[in-house]
Amino acid sequence: MMTLDPDLQSIQEVRNCLAQAKEAQKALEKMSQSQIDAIVRSMAAAAEKEAERLGRMASEETGFGIPADKKRKNLFVARQVYGAIKDMKTVGIIRRDEQAKVWEVAQPV
């Protein structure tokens, strides 16, 4: 059985991830504000639920930081950052300036 060079395997994994990301982006582009809001809400809930485990994993993987501090950082993002962005409009016309004849249109990417 032929083994793949680790660098080549990593490059292929990145290519696969990029292809999946492009497909996900195409799906996100078609979603409504309520669908995007539901995704972001679910992401924040998952981040909060898994804050301790993810903090521990980050510390173990990098060899840096204290798992409890990583957990606090994850909880901050899951709670405060989510709270700050949850009501942002991110789909469709988000601002109109009739005087300048400018409309700002958002599209999820």
Where are these regions (language model features)?
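N-terminal Rossmann-like NAD(P)+-binding subdomain of aldehyde/semialdehyde dehydrogenases
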Residues: 1-109
